[in-house]
Amino acid sequence: SLSDKDKAAVRALWSKIGKSADAIGNDALSRMIVVYPQTKTYFSHWPDVTPGSPHIKAHGKKVMGGIALAVSKIDDLKTGLMELSEQHAYKLRVDPANFKILNHCILVVISTMFPKEFTPEAHVSLDKFLSGVALALAERYR
């Protein structure tokens, strides 16, 4: 679970990178569909599933909006993300393993876009936070 130190590190990092959330989301989602092409199946209803396409950009923005929500609900991710968990479990039917895949892509993008801010301490705290988000999103699958 997240310590107070982890929570503070995530909040501090988000305060520096949050204004770039749309770009992070686009790059992370674009990276995911290239590196893990099987994830494209969730977006087969889109006319264009290429990196940086309008649909990828829009969904990347939506994903990072969810991350911003999670930062604001960091003290109780399970309750704070319940609605998103229900949506992903019952409506979208996303395999929860994909949350971990996207988390990895988000970490890679943040590390390349913000090398100074992405210290080893920030890395471990953000990784733990994103793992907590994935766990909270998977809650309704049980």
Swiss-Prot record:
Annotated ranges, domain Globin: 1-142
Protein's recorded name: Hemoglobin subunit alpha
Pfam families: Globin
PANTHER family per the UniProt record, alphabetical: HEMOGLOBIN FAMILY MEMBER, HEMOGLOBIN SUBUNIT ZETA
UniProt binding sites for heme b: 88
Subunit structure: Hb1 is a heterotetramer of two alpha chains and two beta chains. HbC is a heterotetramer of two alpha chains and two beta-C chains.
Protein purpose: Involved in oxygen transport from gills to the various peripheral tissues.
Modified residues (N-acetylserine): 1
UniProt keyword Metal-binding, yes or no: yes
UniProt note on tissues of expression: Red blood cells.
GO aspect biological process, one term: oxygen transport
InterPro entries from the UniProt entry: Globin, Globin-like_sf, Globin/Proto, Hemoglobin_a-typ, Hemoglobin_oxygen_transport, Hemoglobin_pi
Family label: Belongs to the globin family.
Keywords: Acetylation, Heme, Iron, Metal-binding, Oxygen transport, Transport
